[in-house]
C-alpha cells in the first residue's frame, strides 16, 4: 500500500523480521546487566527501523554467563508488553562451533566446546523454553545426534562458524538442519577452491541461508552471486546487529569485546 504525505510518498509494508540481533541502540543483549529499562530503550530503537519481530542472539560464553543472559531476557520479555510483542524467541549462536582461527569469528575460543545436550537443555530452561534457533558447526563431536534431537523438538538448527566437509554438511542437512547462518562470514579467508563449507552449503537445496547485506561483511558482487545461487525463496537477510548499531561513534561492548 502506498501512503502519501505532503512531502513524500511512502510504502506501507508488514513489519520486518530479523533472526540475529546481538544488541541495538547502545544495549548489549549479551551483557548480564540487562534490565527492563535498557531493553525497552533498545526495542524502541529497533522498532524505529521497521523491524517488528526479532530473535535476541546470545553468543559463546560460559554456561553460567549464558544462563544469566537468557534468564534476564526472558524476565524482561515477561515484564515489557513491547518485548512480548517483538521477541519471538532466542537465537543461541555457539558455543558448539569451530575453534579454528577465522571460523570462530569473534567468539571467545576458551568457551567454545563440544556438544553438550544436557548443558543446552539447562540453557533452554533458563530461557523459558524459548530458544528457537541454534547455530552450530556440524563437524563438532556430538553434533549430528544433537541436530536430530533439536529438529525433533521443533527447534531450528543452523550451520555456522563451520569448517565441515561437504559430506558432513550433507549429513547435517539429512539430520534436520535447515539454515546457514550469515553464510560467507565466520569462515577463514583461505579456503580450498572447490570443496569448502561455503560452496557445500550453497549447493544444498534444503538449506536456506542468512546473509549480512551491509556491503561490509560481504562485498556487493559476492552477495549478488550468493543470492543468484540460493534463489530468493531460500534467502534471509539479517543485520547481526550489536549494541553499537544506530548510535553515535564511541566505545561499546559486545560480550567481552570492546
Explain the meaning of each model-derived region.
Residues 146, 168-258:
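Active-site-adjacent C-terminal substructures of enzyme catalytic domains
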Residues 22-28, 40-69, 85-98, 127-139, ...:
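Divalent metal-dependent hydrolysis catalytic cores, especially in the metallo-beta-lactamase
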Residues 78-85, 127-129, 152-153, 230-231:
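Short helix-capping segments at alpha-helix termini
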Amino acid at each position: 500500500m502506498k501512503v502519501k504525505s505532503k512531502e513524500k510518498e511512502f510504502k506501507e509494508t508488514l513489519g520486518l523480521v530479523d533472526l540475529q540481533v546481538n544488541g541495538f541502540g547502545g544495549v548489549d543483549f549479551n551483557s548480564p546487566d540487562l534490565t527492563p529499562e535498557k531493553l525497552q530503550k533498545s526495542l524502541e530503537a529497533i522498532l524505529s527501523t521497521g523491524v517488528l519481530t526479532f530473535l535476541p542472539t546470545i553468543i559463546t560464553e560460559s554456561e553460567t554467563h549464558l544462563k544469566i543472559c537468557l534468564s534476564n531476557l526472558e524476565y524482561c520479555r515477561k515484564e515489557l508488553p513491547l518485548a512480548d510483542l517483538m521477541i519471538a524467541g532466542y537465537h543461541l549462536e555457539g558455543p558448539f562451533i569451530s575453534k579454528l582461527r577465522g571460523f570462530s569469528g569473534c567468539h571467545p575460543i576458551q568457551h567454545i566446546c563440544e556438544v553438550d545436550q544436557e548443558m543446552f537443555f539447562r540453557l533452554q530452561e533458563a530461557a523459558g523454553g524459548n530458544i528457537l534457533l541454534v547455530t552450530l558447526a556440524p563437524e563438532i563431536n556430538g553434533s549430528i545426534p544433537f541436530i536430530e534431537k533439536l529438529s525433533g523438538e521443533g527447534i531450528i538448527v543452523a550451520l555456522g562458524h563451520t569448517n565441515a566437509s561437504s559430506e558432513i554438511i550433507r549429513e547435517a542437512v539429512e539430520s534436520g538442519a535447515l539454515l546457514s547462518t550469515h553464510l560467507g562470514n565466520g569462515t577463514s579467508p583461505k579456503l580450498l577452491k572447490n570443496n569448502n563449507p561455503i560452496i557445500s552449503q550453497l549447493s544444498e537445496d534444503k538449506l536456506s541461508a542468512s546473509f549480512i547485506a551491509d556491503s561490509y561483511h560481504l562485498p556487493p558482487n559476492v552477495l549478488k552471486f550468493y543470492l543468484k545461487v540460493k534463489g530468493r525463496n531460500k534467502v534471509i537477510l539479517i543485520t547481526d546487529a550489536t549494541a553499537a548499531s544506530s548510535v553515535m561513534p564511541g566505545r561499546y561492548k559486545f560480550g567481552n569485546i570492546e
